[in-house]
């Protein structure tokens, strides 16, 4: 999931450099959502493993 977040972040950066603001914003939102979801799942897995 971290890989997909990085891919969408790179797409957002490339799109912003090329002037595609809508695509850059959408890709940045996807990257943020995927990164947040991955961190939450990591924390849940870490806590459930320790108990």
UniProtKB/Swiss-Prot annotation:
GO CC annotation: plasma membrane
Signal peptide region: none
Disulphide connectivity of cysteines: none
Keyword Cell membrane: yes
Alphabetical UniProt keywords: Cell membrane, Membrane, Transmembrane, Transmembrane helix
Locations listed in the record: Cell membrane
Stretches that traverse the bilayer: 6-26, 28-47
Pfam hit, one: DUF1328
Similarity comment: Belongs to the UPF0391 family.
Protein name listed in UniProt: UPF0391 membrane protein Psyc_0130
Organism the protein comes from: Psychrobacter arcticus (strain DSM 17307 / VKM B-2377 / 273-4)
